[in-house]
Amino acid sequence: MAKLVTLHDTDGEVIYPQTISDMDYSTSEQDTGCKWIDGKKIYKKTIDFGALPNASIKNVDHGVANIARVVKIDGIISFGSNNWSNIPLVYQGVDSIYNAEFQVTTTQVHCATSKDRSNLSAIITFYYTKTTD
């Protein structure tokens, strides 16, 4: 059973309740201890995606079998050794240089870019249910 962690602001209001299992990351499949709206267990896995593509599409096998539904995708993009941003990358402006689209299929993590983003790298965590539960 995951332990509940509650963060409070200075007035004692709850900011973001989450479980310890939500804060654990692994390149191996993990049972999050949570359930999806259909009652199935939610699992997660973190992938070191490596460098983003140069105005193209890059696919990385994730090694998870029996995915029924992906329920969440998030992660970070690294702009060098000491500059990071969340995925999805939120950017104010219309310059597509910052665009990077991530998708998860039953076999791979896909990334598509419209410009050369090979100087950036990504770590992706995706959450999913399984057909075997």
At which residue positions do the language-model features occur?
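Extracellular receptor-binding modules and their adjoining Ser/Thr/Gly/Asp/Asn-rich linkers
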Residues: 2-13, 18-68, 117-133
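Generic structural motif
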Residues: 27-29, 72, 100-102
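Extended, low-complexity, turn-rich repeat/linker tracts enriched in Gly/Pro/Ser/Thr and Asp/Glu
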Residues: 79-82, 117-118
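Surface-exposed interaction regions enriched in Ser/Thr/Asp/Glu
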Residues: 91-133
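Short, surface-exposed beta-strand/strand-loop-strand elements in extracellular ectodomains
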Residues: 85-91
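Intrinsically disordered, low-complexity regions enriched in Ser/Pro/Gly/Gln/His and often acidic
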Residues: 27-29, 77, 95
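Solvent-exposed beta-hairpin/edge-strand motifs
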Residues: 65-77
